[in-house]
Amino acid sequence: MRIDLSQCGRTLTENAEFIRAAEKSGFQGAWVSEIAGLDAISSATVAALSLQQGRVGSAIFPMQTRDPLLLAMSAASLSQIAPGGFVLGLGTSTKIIIEGWHATDWGNSPLSLTRECVDLVRRFLDGERITSDIGRWKYNRAQLTVEPQHRVPIYLAALNDRMLELAG
């Protein structure tokens, strides 16, 4: 059975120490989250560099606070340093957190936003050059210029039946 852990410290240094100790005790990976504390990219980097073998995952990166190209850039970069690979966990968070805490539009349709974001992230990670003026994000010949070390699985945080259906 695979057993992973979530970040527990209040500082990146505490997280690094905790992750190293947990891996020695049998944990096989680390998951990082983001609301208004530690930045998840920094936390994921620390986790990846603290592990000897384990995977790192995001639980979750809110899709409204980073565009799909930036998400793909982060995932590809983290896949290069996480010894067991990187899992990109995405979600829509909540309207209160996205609009009230992050001062950005939550959107009218979380399902459409998720479908669009996952499609674009996967296409970027697969090396595709994208021109798109449909939906939330507009791109003009955008392309990821770094390759992931491992194929990056995309996990979805689902809060209703239609999102569960999309997640598979």
Predicted segments — roles?
Residues 8-10, 33-35, 61-63, 91-95, ...:
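Active-site beta-loop-alpha junctions enriched in small/polar residues
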Residues 60-70:
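Structural motif corresponding to the early beta-alpha repeats
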Residues 39, 66, 95-98:
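Generic structural signal for helix capping and beta-alpha/helix-loop junctions
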Residues 1-59, 152:
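N-terminal beta1-alpha1-beta2 module of alpha/beta enzyme domains
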Residues 48-49, 69, 146:
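Short glycine-biased active-site loop of nucleotidyltransferases that positions the nucleotide triphosphate
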Residues 14, 72-168:
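Internal, glycine-rich beta/alpha segment that forms the wall or movable "lid"
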